Design a protein with these regions (language model features):
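Helix-turn-helix/homeodomain-like alpha-helical modules used for DNA recognition
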Residues: 65-105
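N-terminal core-binding DNA-recognition domain of tyrosine recombinases/integrases
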Residues: 58-66
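Recognition helix of helix-turn-helix/homeodomain-like DNA-binding domains
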Residues: 28-45
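Short alpha-helical "recognition helix" segments of helix-turn-helix
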Residues: 23-24
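A short, Lys/Arg-rich alpha-helix, primarily the initiator
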Residues: 1-15
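Residues at alpha-helix boundaries and the short loops/turns that link adjacent helices
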Residues: 14-17, 43
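Short Lys/Arg-enriched helix C-cap and helix-to-coil transition segments
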Residues: 44-59
Length: 105
């Protein structure tokens, strides 16, 4: 399983995406972006991955706000938050490594 498949499967498990179009939108791109990149054997751009990471951060912030305002999260939402957190950190680590390695797209 490549990185993109891992990200997709985890975000699907967390309930954030239902299909590749949803993931494309979270990356700030058109519907077919993810399927097109996969078909061409290319990784998503740094811009798309940064956009995705910041959208995941916003999702986590919304969950934190829910808790802050006194609402309890269900066990499923807590698991989803943990998955989203892991995916976000994975993406940021990958972006950092690519930028340090000079692999800008």
């Amino acid at each position: 399983m490549n990185d993109l498949d891992w990200i997709y499967e985890n975000l699907r498990e967390a309930g954030l995406v239902q299909n590749q179009n949803d993931l494309s939108h979270l990356c700030g791109m058109d519907d077919s972006y993810i399927s097109s990149r996969k078909a061409k054997g290319k990784e998503p751009s740094l811009e798309a991955m940064a956009h995705l990471a910041f959208n995941l951060e916003a999702e986590l912030q919304a969950l934190e706000d829910t808790i802050r305002y006194g609402e309890d999260l269900t066990a499923d939402r807590l698991v989803a938050a943990s998955i989203i957190y892991d995916v976000k950190n994975h993406i940021f680590a990958d972006l950092k490594a690519k930028c340090r390695g000079g692999r800008h797209e």
